[in-house]
Amino acid sequence: MLDTANYTPRLKAAFSETIKAAMKEEFGYKNDMQIPRLEKIVLNIGSGAESVRDTKKAKSAQEDLTAIAGQHAVVTKAKKSIAGFRLREEHPVGAKVTLRGDRMYDFLDRLTTIAMPRIRDFRGVKPSFDGRGNFAMGMKEHIVFPEINFDKIDVAWGMDIIIVTTANTDAEAKSLLAHFNMPFNA
């Protein structure tokens, strides 16, 4: 039985034990508070045209995202009506969830060690940073996560994963994520 009172995620322990020291040496930080750390991970599934025809699709996306994240996901709604897409204001269009703390570290661990190796023809992720140390990536199918039962899903959703760090530069953020075993391709 897992003792949740004393549980520390594997990557969180690695950060405090080895990654902090490696980052301090690599970038010459004088203070531990200068070392970049993970702030949050935002997961988003846009159900798109599927939910315009059937509003239950957004609910399905929410349930799948809740299973993947281990935390309740929120249904996202359209901000304004767009007649060309048959979209109405406040119509459900997807789901999102923000992970912080231990759940964030657990998700990143599952992403890099379980989900990414299950992607067909996977050659690493493109290092797409925003200039301020935040990393964004997309996945074509959410079925690579072990929490999703392939037989029970009706649609294979694509999903966005945004990793927000306290890093000031992209080089610092890339180094931090590389220490967390993020498989970059270049």
Swiss-Prot record:
Q: Please give a single GO biological process term from the UniProt record.
A: translation
What Pfam families is this protein classified in?
Ribosomal_L5, Ribosomal_L5_C
The record's note on quaternary structure and interaction partners says: Part of the 50S ribosomal subunit; part of the 5S rRNA/L5/L18/L25 subcomplex. Contacts the 5S rRNA and the P site tRNA. Forms a bridge to the 30S subunit in the 70S ribosome.
Any one GO CC term of this protein is: ribosome
Name the source organism.
Jannaschia sp. (strain CCS1)
Key word tRNA-binding present in the record?
Answer: yes
Query: By its UniProt entry, which InterPro entries does this protein fall under?
Result: Ribosomal_uL5 (IPR002132), Ribosomal_uL5_bac-type (IPR020930), Ribosomal_uL5_C (IPR031309), Ribosomal_uL5_CS (IPR020929), Ribosomal_uL5_dom_sf (IPR022803), Ribosomal_uL5_N (IPR031310)
* Protein's name according to its UniProt entry: Large ribosomal subunit protein uL5
